[in-house]
Amino acid sequence: MKLKTNIRHLHGSIRVPGDKSISHRSIIFGSLAEGETKVYDILRGEDVLSTMQVFRDLGVEIEDKDGVITIQGVGMAGLKAPQNALNMGNSGTSIRLISGVLAGADFEVEMFGDDSLSKRPMDRVTLPLKKMGVSISGQTERDLPPLRLKGTKNLRPIHYELPIASAQVKSALMFAALQAKGESVIIEKEYTRNHTEDMLKQFGGHLSVDGKKITVQGPQKLTGQKVVVPGDISSAAFWLVAGLIAPNSRLVLQNVGINETRTGIIDVIRAMGGKLEITEIDPVAKSATLIVESSDLKGTEIGGALIPRLIDELPIIALLATQAQGVTVIKDAEELKVKETDRIQVVADALNSMGADITPTADGMIIKGKSALHGARVNTFGDHRIGMMTAIAALLVADGEVELDRAEAINTSYPSFFDDLESLIHG
């Protein structure tokens, strides 16, 4: 598709779609709880719809009516063997978390996904699940999907140190631990998003968190709840950057989730000198209104414990860095290589084709700014965040056209992205 270029300003106020991580987990917890769960403001992107369909296939009644998702929970032991293989679509979150959920189910399943998911290694979650007594295997020594899994009612608790920072692996092991008899201990390498911990408590579960050490005593029962999903800061990130780098711009983003494990991009914007205001903070919902304005930016260094707090935002942060004076270094981010694409290489190739100066490294990028961007043809390779990054980059292009191939990938997380972009261009 041909993207909008050379815009004069961005103005307006929007509510970004519901948080993808919380949306996935609300369906999972609602299904495993006893009683009814109602979920408001859920993200209806393709990844979350995949999770919803998987739990329907596992025998859970889920109704989507009048903007509210109603889940009739079946309890920890109530899932039923599916008639067919479970389709996870493009969703790494779905296949990893649901592997943990099915660890205690005494039936065999096959889980598969699209071409992109089939290239993503699952050994980081299959290895610890095997230690708990689960029979699970995939293709090659990295356990690429499709996966075959047979759970067990005699799930063993686990004491496990995560070799990488991964909220998905941590969450999969927590779901498994809820079904094991005894105490499981999970130790994180770095702090990662803690939505699973928060929602476990919300649904009446128990755990203790001591620094990076999480202890779960199993088995447990959960109780259905009302869940209100805040806006996704990973989706808001595209507008935060757009408002900072587009000329004569001011954007107001309402009801954005600001869980402290997800706000690394706010730290980066401030380090780069961006104009960012946080107002209307709701400490219970962990949400706020974010306001950004066009800014003069400077390069910075991004690495270490900051990386898990902004791993999904690094593509759009790379674009931000191309519009900052000086050098920005992104390091300790080798995890980018096993996302929907190798995001280190694909981001560098896409932005360099538009005139940026980015050098890929083994664990990140070196970005020299400030760059004038020009027209190009960019392929998302099925990666939603590459698509949205390119659409924001195109706004700055004064010379030439920007063509985006496989733009439909954006529907994975933000189906209304181009509608919101139009409203801000004309605001």
Swiss-Prot record:
Gene Ontology molecular function: any one: 3-phosphoshikimate 1-carboxyvinyltransferase activity
GO terms of biological process kind: amino acid biosynthetic process; aromatic amino acid family biosynthetic process; chorismate biosynthetic process
Function: Catalyzes the transfer of the enolpyruvyl moiety of phosphoenolpyruvate (PEP) to the 5-hydroxyl of shikimate-3-phosphate (S3P) to produce enolpyruvyl shikimate-3-phosphate and inorganic phosphate.
Name of protein: 3-phosphoshikimate 1-carboxyvinyltransferase
Entry EC number(s): 2.5.1.19
Encoding gene per record: aroA
Catalytic activity: 3-phosphoshikimate + phosphoenolpyruvate = 5-O-(1-carboxyvinyl)-3-phosphoshikimate + phosphate
Residues reported in the UniProt entry to bind phosphoenolpyruvate: K20, G92, R120, Q168, R343, R385
Subunit structure: Homotetramer.
